Amino acid sequence: ASSFLFWYKNLYLSLPKIFGMPTLLITFGMRFFFYLDEHQPIHVHVDCNSKKAKIALEPSVSLVYNHGLKEQELKKASETCAIYRDDFIAEWHKRFD
């Protein structure tokens, strides 16, 4: 699958809000995003072809729930969260603090 990265080295490109939800990253067919009314603990939502997951970023990257993602998709989503964890957390603080 083609990968659409909106990240460049040390540069975050803020995408327009899609369906009222700030998108952080689109890659491997997965969209990583926040809802507008988020709450602690810090986490991201993942959408992959209408399948959904929620991944906590603190205290460490961990799965909160999964609704339909396959094991391989969950692994890729968790790995992506680990790679971009600091960027996602910084964006959380910019939006919700």
Locations of regions flagged by a protein language model:
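Conserved recognition-core residues within compact binding domains
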Residues: 14-16, 23, 50
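Short, charged low-complexity linear motifs
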Residues: 21, 28-30, 69, 73-78
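C-terminal structural segments of small proteins and small subunits
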Residues: 71-97
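A short, structured beta-strand/loop element
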Residues: 35-69
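Short, charged/polar N-terminal "headpieces" of proteins
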Residues: 18-40
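Cationic, amphipathic, low-complexity segments that mediate targeting or membrane/lipid association
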Residues: 1-3
